[in-house]
Amino acid sequence: MTEGKSIINANLTPLPDKVGVDGLEDKWRAVWDEDGTYKFRNTRDRKAVYSIDTPPPTVSGSLHVGHVFSYTHTDVIARYKRMRGYDVFYPMGWDDNGLPTERRVQNYYGVRVDVSLPYDPDFKPPFEGTDGKKIDAKDQVPISRKNFIELCERLTAQDEKLFEALWRKLGLSIDWSQTYHTIGQHPQRVAQKAFLRNLARGEAYQQDAPGLWDVTFQTAVAQAELESREYPGFYHKVAFRFEDGTPIYIETTRPELLAACTSLIANPNDERYKQYFGQYVYSPLFKVKVPILAHPAAEMDKGAGIAMCCTFGDVTDVEWWRDLKLPTRPIIQRNGRIVMDTPDWIEDPAGREVFAETAGKTTFSARKIIVDKLRESGDLDGEPTPTKRMTNFYEKGDKPLEIVTSRQWYLKNGGTDAKLNAELIERGKELEFHPDFMRVRYENWVHGLNGDWLISRQRFFGVPFPLWYPVNASGEPDYDHPITPSEDRLPIDPTIDVPEGYDESQRDVPGGFTAEKDIMDTWATSSLTPQIVTHWAEPDEASKALFASTFPMDLRPQGQDIIRTWLFSTVDRAHLENKCLPWAHATLSGWILDPDHKKMSKSKGNVVVPNEPIEKFGADAVRYWAAAARLGLDATYDIGQMKIGRRLAIKLLNATKFALAIGREDENHHVGAAAEAAWNPADVTEPLDRAAMAKLALVVRQATEALESYEHSKALEVIESYFWQFCDDYIELVKNRAYGTPDEHGNVPSEKAVKSARTALGLGLDAFARLLAPYLPYATEEVWSWMHAGSGSVHRTAWPVVDPYVEAATGASPELLTWAGKAVEQLRKIKSEAKVSMKTPILSVALSAASEGVEAIHAALGDIAQAGRVVGKFDLVAKHAEESAAEDAPETEVAVEASELGEPPAKKPKH
C-alpha cells in the first residue's frame, strides 16, 4: 500500500470463491514467523520504542482462559502501538522457579528432596506424569537436590513448549527471540547482582526473628503472600490461678500453646483488670509463673478481654513479645509438631509429664490432649464453644500458618522505614494506573505494611543467595560477616561454587566456609523483570544499547490480585536500584468468572482450557470476547460473545470480498485477475458517501483516543458499532450504484457517482482492516492481503488517521447515513409486516421524519429508493418537534405514513 496526499493505492489480488476463518491461523502464523513481523528492531532511540514488561506466567501445568483474557488486553495495545509507528519491545518470559513448580514436579515424577543424598547422574524417576494426582510424601522417592533441580528444568521445558504454542495460536505479537526464564543464567545473574547491591547499601539484611511459616511447604512466607480465610475452631474458657488459687479466666482457640505462655495481657483502659497489672498467676497444667501486663493492642470486647501471650500463636503475640520484651518460649517445630524435648521453663514435675504426652504430636492432636487434661484438672470452665475466625494462610497452602523463629533475609520496602514508605507512596502517584481507581489498592497496601519484605525461602528450585559464611574454630557459621563474590563471577551456586581464597576441602569445616542454602522467593526474581528483559547492568555493548532504548519501560500489564506482590515489589526494586519507576503505565485486568460468577482458578477446579474455545470458535473470536471486557472489571466466560466475535470476523471477510469484487467479477461471479485501484478522497462526491466518510473520521478519532487511554474495550465498541452500520446500512444503500445498476426507471448512475461509491467502499474497508487489526489479527491480515498485495502485513501498516476521511467528507454530517439507514429500515418493515419478499417493489410510499431527517433522507433519496425498490412516488413529510412529541412519535424518528406494495416477484422454478 502507498499513501500520499490521502490517496490510497491498492494492489488487488484475485479473490477466493469461498471465505471463512478456518485455516487462517496456521497460514498467517507461518508468514509472520518467516517475515519477522513482530521482531524488535532496536534501531532507534528511546522515544521511538514502546516497551512492555509482559507477565511471565507461572509454569506449573496449564493455562486457563483467564490468562488468554488478560494477555489479549496487552496484545491489543502492543499491536496498536506498532501501527502507530513504535518499535515495540514485547518479550515473553516463563516464571519457572518456586513452590508451584516444585509441587508439580513432586507429583509428576513422584519424588522429593533429601539434601543428604548424593547426585545420581543415571537417576530415572518412578513416574512420568500422574494426571495431576497428588502422590503422598511417604510414596515419593527421595533424591538429591541436584537431581530434583534437573527434573524441575526438564518438566518446565516441556510445559513452556505447550504455553508458547498456545500463545502463538492466540496470535500474540510476541518477539519470541526475546524469551527469558526466571531460573535461567541471565535472570539469576540479574537477581544476584541486585541483591548484592542491596546488601552493600544496607537495604538487604538478615535477622533471627519470628515469622510466618508454612508447615506443608516448610518455608517462611512473606506478608504479601498471605490470604486471610475463615477457619473453624473452638473457644476454650481456661483458668489461670493466683498464688492463693483464685482463678482469672482467659478464652483461647489454641489451648495447645499453654506451655508457650509468657504472660497475660489486657488493655490498660480495661477497668476489670487494672487492679491486676504487675501481679503474677500460674498457668494451668504446667504451673509456670507469668505476669499480667497491659498493652493497648488488647481488645476489651474480644473473649474475656484478657488474653494469654504465647510465643507464638499469632502476629499479635509477636507485637506484644517485641513491645513488652517478653521471653521466647517456642514449642512448635518447623514441621508443625510440638517439640520433642520438654522445655526448661516447665519445672513442675506434673507439668513436665503433661508436656511429654504432647511431644512430637501435631497441634491438632496436642490440642485434644490438653483439653482433656484441663477437664480433669478443673481448669476448663464449661465446654468449648464453636467459633469461626479469620486465620492467615499461605496463598498456595491449605493449613493455617504457624509463627516460627528462624534466620531469614529481608529487603527494605517501607514496612519499617517511614521515609522509604513515603517515597514509595509518591512513586505510586507518579504511576499511571488503568483504571485509575486501582491506585488506592496500591496505596492501601503500602500504608498497611508492618514489616520489611521477607525474601528467603527454605526450598530448592530457585535463585540461590550468592553468599557463604566463615566457619569459626568451633565449627559455627559467622552469619554477621557473609562472604560475597565479585559481580563478574555471577551467577553462582554457593552449594557448588567456592568463595575466593578458599578451596572445596574447606567447605563445612572449622576455619573454612559454609554455603547459604536458602533460595530467593520467586517474587524476588519476578520483581526484577524490567531489569531482566532490558539487560540492566550487563557489560556488553548490545545489552547497554537495549537497556538505553527500553528502560524505564512503558507498560506493565497484570492482574489486579497481584498489585501487592508483583507490582509493588517491582516498584520497590526499581526505586532502590534505579531511582525511578520501572514503567510509566500499569494496566490491571479483572478476573474471569465461571457461569456461577465465581472466580475461575485451577484450585477451584472450574477452569476452562483455552485450547477448547480457540479450536471451536477461532482465535479471533476468543480475542474478541477478551477485548470486549473493560480493564479492572471482572468478566464472565461467555461463549455467546465468542460467537459474536466469529461472526464479526466472517462479516469482515465477506464484506471486503463483496466490495473488492465490484466491477471485477466474471459471469460466474469469480474474480480471477489482479487489479490496481486508487482510492482518492477527492473522488467521493455523493452526499451519502461523504456522510459515511464523516462517520469514519469520527470513529477513527474516538478509537484512537480510547486506545491512547488504554481503553481497548471502548475503542472496540466504537469500531464494531460503525462496522455493522457500514455493512448493514451503507453497503446495502450504495451497492446498486457501485455496480452501476440502472434504477427501476432505467436510469444509469453517472460514472462520477459510481466512482464515488467504489472509492468510499475502498477507503472504508481499508480503514476497518486497520482498525480491527489489533483485535482480529488473522481475519484482518487475510483481507489486507486481498487489498494490498506485496505491501507487507497490516500489522506493520500505519494506524488510520482522520485526514483522508475528513477530506472525503468535505463537511458532510455523519447523521445523513443514520437517517438514510432508518428510512431503509422502514421500507424493509413494510415488506416484513406484509410477509412478502424484500425484492417486492413498493409502488408508492410516504415517510415522515423530523425536519433535519427529511433533509438528510432527501439528499440520499436515490440510493434509498433503489435499496428499498421504490418504483413510484416517494414522498417525505416533515414533522415539527412539537408535533412529534404530541403524537408520541416512535423512537425510530422515521415513520411510514402511507405505502402501496406491488406484486412480489415470481419464484424461480426449482430444477
From Swiss-Prot:
Catalytic activity: tRNA(Val) + L-valine + ATP = L-valyl-tRNA(Val) + AMP + diphosphate
SUPFAM superfamilies on file: Anticodon-binding domain of a subclass of class I aminoacyl-tRNA synthetases, Nucleotidylyl transferase, ValRS/IleRS/LeuRS editing domain
Motif 'KMSKS' region, residue range(s) on this chain: 599-603
CDD domains, sorted: Anticodon_Ia_Val
Domain of life: Bacteria
GO BP, sorted A to Z: valyl-tRNA aminoacylation
Region (Disordered): 882-911
Record family assignment: Belongs to the class-I aminoacyl-tRNA synthetase family. ValS type 2 subfamily.
Protein name: Valine--tRNA ligase
